């Protein structure tokens, strides 16, 4: 398996020109909308997606949106930041090569995790934008595995859903030679993205890592429309429950956004 893993690292896709810089700047909490518009216009594909989204039933504009500036204004800073980061990364992969991979579910839970991390971050003394970006990118390795190893990825999903199967991480290591977090770290390293932005390599007990893990678990529970597991709650149960309830109310809208974008 390790030989296969080493071979696969040679197939890591490159980011679109300017995508790495776009990620760094848009993830900065101090970036304003004018600068985001400038960055988005560097990438015609991202600009087109934002325009399409701003003109969709999801956005429900009163009149046609015809400029990137108006599209960003219509969608709002948080939506533009999240979708631009997701598109900058996501366009490097074709997860449809793996029919078992549910792209809508992946992006919906990733966006929910990003929103949750942003809400939880202040309680841990972590910058909300940094936490949101790290949570959004946490499982990006899944896209790479679905694109580059579709058959192995399908086998991992079959393993994880079997009655006597293991958890997904174990099944991914068995079928693909690495789990989703290891795959993500390989991408971050190859793309030279800073650890502060991705959460990769962070101490498992660090505030940022804890936020990412809790946000991911909560996002999965929200997507499944289940009650918040007590084990998921941090020290302040009431605050965590409040965040969970708030973001749960965004599920339908987030599902629609993920379907439009991906």
What is each of the regions a protein language model found here?
Residues 1-4, 234-262:
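Terminal helices and disordered tails flanking the catalytic cores of nucleotide-processing hydrolases
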Residues 1-157, 161-164, 168-230, 262:
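Conserved alpha-helical "signature site"
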């Amino acid at each position: 398996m390790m030989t296969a893993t080493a071979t696969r690292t040679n197939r890591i896709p490159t980011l679109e020109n300017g995508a790495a810089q776009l990620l760094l700047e848009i993830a900065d909490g101090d970036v304003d909308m004018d600068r985001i518009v400038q960055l988005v216009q560097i990438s015609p594909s991202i600009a087109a997606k934002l325009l399409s989204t701003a003109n969709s039933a999801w956005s429900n504009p009163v009149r046609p949106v015809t400029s990137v500036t108006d599209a960003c204004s219509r969608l709002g800073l948080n939506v533009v930041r999240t979708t631009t980061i997701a598109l900058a990364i996501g366009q490097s992969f074709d997860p449809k090569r793996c029919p078992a991979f549910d792209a809508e579910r992946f992006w919906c839970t990733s966006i929910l995790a990003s929103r949750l991390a942003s809400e939880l971050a202040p309680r841990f003394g972590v910058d909300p934008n940094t936490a949101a970006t790290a949570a959004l990118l946490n499982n990006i390795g899944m896209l790479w595995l679905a694109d580059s190893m579709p058959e192995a990825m399908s086998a991992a999903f079959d393993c994880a859903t079997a009655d006597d199967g293991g958890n997904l991480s174990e099944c991914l290591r068995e079928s693909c030679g690495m789990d989703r977090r290891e795959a993500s770290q390989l991408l971050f390293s190859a793309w030279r993205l800073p650890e502060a932005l991705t959460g990769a390599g962070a101490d498992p007990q660090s505030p940022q890592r804890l936020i990412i893990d809790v946000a991911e678990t909560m996002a999965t529970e929200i997507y499944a429309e289940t009650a918040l597991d007590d084990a998921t709650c941090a020290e302040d149960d009431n605050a965590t429950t409040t965040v969970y309830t708030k973001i749960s109310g965004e599920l339908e809208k987030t599902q629609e956004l993920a379907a439009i974008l991906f």
